[in-house]
Structure formats: C-alpha cells, structure tokens
C-alpha cells in the first residue's frame, strides 16, 4: 500500500488505463500546517476513476490530559514522561487534525474546503457551480452570493432550484 507518493508518481499512475485502484494508506501528514498541499493530491485523485483517495495521517493528536507544575492544562506526549528513560515518538504523537479532546486544528478547515461537495468558481462573468456529490442533484439546495467592492456589498443574488446532476457543473449569472 503506497504512502506519501510524490505527485509525479500519482500523475503517472492516474494517466494510465488501469483497473486496479490506487489508494494511499497515508498522505497529507497533518503535523503543523503540512496539509497545505491537500488540494494538489485531491485534484490528481479526481482526474482518474482508479485513483481512490487515501487516509490523512493523523486524525487525532495522541496526547494525554495533564496538568503542569504551574497548574495549567496541556496535552502530554513523548518526552513529557522522561525522554531519557523511554523510547517515544517525540512530537509525532500530536500531529492530527483535531486535539485529543477533538478541538479542531486550523488544518481541518483546509480539509473541509478541499473535500466540499459543492464548489464555486468565477468563469468570465458567470459563477460555475460544480456538483461533487455522487447521487444528489443540487436542486434541493439554496444558494446566495454577494459581490463586494472594498468590503461593501454592492450586489446580492439568491439562487433557488439550481438543477445540476451529480458529477456535473452548471453556469449561472
């Protein structure tokens, strides 16, 4: 099972006519701000039917609820328990998209944005709406957009009943 494959390898696999799926058992390591290249992975995976996706490492920080000498709460991990005495993964224990108590880290917002089921892009003077759902038409959704100039709304429009089949896009004005 591949993990952390370079984009060139993914592009090569995606460009071939193959029947076997390609699934990354681990990708977009969430340590710090390293999920920042998630969009590139997602775009490659969506270009080919046999690119099946993968698993972001890591979902949750693996820290232990602790109170410091100063009385403040913190998530203990690795060397907090005597690095000189034990083998440990140092800060590779706290490298997830959410804290041990499931508080979201900023990187989770990037994942949410990249994985969204409905995408919008400006194409010339139209808004293109992409329906990334597998089974749901967009007609059940309501949309609204604003046009702003120097932070002030100069135009608003509501869109109701936009028909767009799964996997398709529609341009609206």
Question: Where are these predicted regions, by residue range?
Answer:
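Intrinsically disordered, low-complexity Pro/Gly/Ser/Thr-rich segments with frequent PxxP/GP/PP motifs
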Residues: 142-173
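Extended substrate-binding grooves/exosites of carbohydrate-active enzymes
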Residues: 1-125, 133-139, 144-153
């Amino acid at each position: 099972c591949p993990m952390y494959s370079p984009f060139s390898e993914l592009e090569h696999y995606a460009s071939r006519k193959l029947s076997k799926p390609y699934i990354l058992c681990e990708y977009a390591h969430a340590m710090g701000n390293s999920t920042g290249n998630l969009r590139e992975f997602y775009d490659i995976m969506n270009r080919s039917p046999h690119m099946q996706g993968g698993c972001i490492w890591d979902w949750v920080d693996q820290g232990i609820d602790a109170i410091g000498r100063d009385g403040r709460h913190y998530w203990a991990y690795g060397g907090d328990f005597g690095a000189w005495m034990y083998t440990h993964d140092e800060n590779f224990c706290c490298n997830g998209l959410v804290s041990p108590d499931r508080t979201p880290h900023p990187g989770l917002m990037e994942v949410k944005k990249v994985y969204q089921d409905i995408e919008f892009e400006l194409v010339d003077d139209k808004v293109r709406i992409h329906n990334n759902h597998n089974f749901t038409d967009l007609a059940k959704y309501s949309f609204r957009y604003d046009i702003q100039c120097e932070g002030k709304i100069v135009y608003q429009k509501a869109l109701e009943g936009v028909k767009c089949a799964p996997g398709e896009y529609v341009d609206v004005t």
